[in-house]
A protein has these predicted regions:
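Conserved acid/base catalytic micro-environments in cytosolic active-site loops
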Residues: 2-23, 27-43, 49, 54-69, ...
Length: 362
């Protein structure tokens, strides 16, 4: 049910004009190769090539750019230092890290995603841009292109005028979902909840499977609460963080004795996020009812919207990350605009509200 909800923004239509790309790499050879590769694809238009993070900031201050291809190891400002500033004042410009340091599953790659990168791609040496790599890169960039194109005319929404629902007074379980920019927000929420071991916590973050063990390790460093990668039929434990694996959606079911168990699903959702937030939220609503608390954090698209509807329909409640603290306000924004949120807050205050309402209902 949750998987049949809404298409993500990444699959929405665009106006057909090419995406304006800035290439940032200290290697002249790489800049030329990437410029040629992108220049031959009608979906993209290379508007500039620069050799450093400092030059990139100067460029975007003067010229509109939809998508930035960014190296990490550069003089003056490296890619990780400049990344948050390149996202733009409304945090809607797409930045893709393309670096030899960004092998899939590496801690550097996870750090880049935590800072708001739309994607990370491991870069081969300049002389080894094979046709297979070029096709892979263009496919990854094309997936982000519709969202980058919409950054030209960002939708205006007065967050202060949003209709908010009353917060719940019963907290039996908390489920947290995020995507682009969500990792740092998740860590902040978890740090605020670590002194309360009374309820189980479920987390779905849009990440490939190879990154999930690294995220689990980051969570363990952030809290003394136990952190487990969810497995099929695993009993749900209070005071434990259950992290969705990258290979399946995190859902819930009941065992023969009525205990709540982890259920993993590989059913594809229409919005194609994997793992997706909607199945987790929907399962939370089904098994915890008015004690279900959903938290939707920074991310592109609308994953979590259908699940938030399920939580509210079961008399549970949902908290959305506020616009100002979000790298991308797509997922939380869709919940707020849908009138489903009980509060819009920065991550640290989300944890405070959950504990406040839990104590009120204890």
């Amino acid at each position: 049910m949750a998987c049949a909800a809404l298409l993500s923004d990444a699959s929405s239509g665009t106006d057909g004009s090419p995406i304006d790309v800035l290439i940032v790499d200290d290697s002249l050879v790489v800049r030329r190769v990437l410029g040629r590769v992108l220049g031959e694809d009608p979906r993209f238009r290379v508007v500039g090539t620069v050799a450093s993070g400092k030059q990139a900031l100067a460029f975007v201050a003067k010229k509109s750019v939809d998508l930035v291809l960014l190296d990490i190891d550069m003089p003056e400002l490296d890619g990780l230092q400049v990344l948050p500033h390149l996202l733009g004042p409304d945090q809607r410009r797409q930045v893709v890290l393309l670096s030899g340091s960004c092998s899939e599953g590496s801690e550097v790659a996870l750090q880049a995603l935590a800072l708001g990168a739309g994607d990370v791609v491991a870069k081969p040496s300049a002389g080894h841009f094979s046709p297979q790599f070029v096709e892979h890169l263009l496919d990854r960039l094309a997936h982000l292109a519709p969202a980058a194109e919409r950054s030209r005319t960002p939708e205006r929404f007065d967050e202060a005028s949003a209709r908010l629902r009353p917060p719940g007074t019963l907290v039996r379980a908390v489920a947290i979902g995020g995507s682009t920019g969500g990792i740092s927000a998740i860590l902040s929420v978890i740090k605020g909840l670590e002194d309360n071991p009374a309820f189980p916590i479920f987390i779905t973050q849009h990440l490939p499977a190879s990154f999930q063990p690294l995220l689990a390790e980051q969570l363990r460093r952030a809290t003394h609460l136990p952190v487990v990668l969810a497995e099929q039929a695993m009993p749900v434990q209070p005071g434990t963080i259950h992290l969705a694996p990258g290979t399946a959606h995190l859902s819930l079911g009941k065992g023969a004795r009525g205990q709540i168990l982890v259920r993993l699903s590989t059913q594809r959702c229409l919005h194609e996020s994997f793992p997706a937030v909607d199945p987790m939220f929907t399962a939370l609503a089904r098994h915890y009812g008015r004690g279900a608390c959903g938290v939707i954090l920074s991310g592109m698209g609308r994953d979590g919207l259908a699940g938030a509807q399920a939580i509210v329909g079961a008399d549970g409640w949902v908290i959305a990350q506020d616009h100002q603290s979000s790298a991308v306000w797509g997922m939380p924004g869709s919940v707020v605009k849908g009138g489903l949120a009980s509060a819009t807050l920065p991550p640290a205050q989300i944890a405070e509200l959950i504990l406040q309402q839990w104590q009120a209902g204890a």
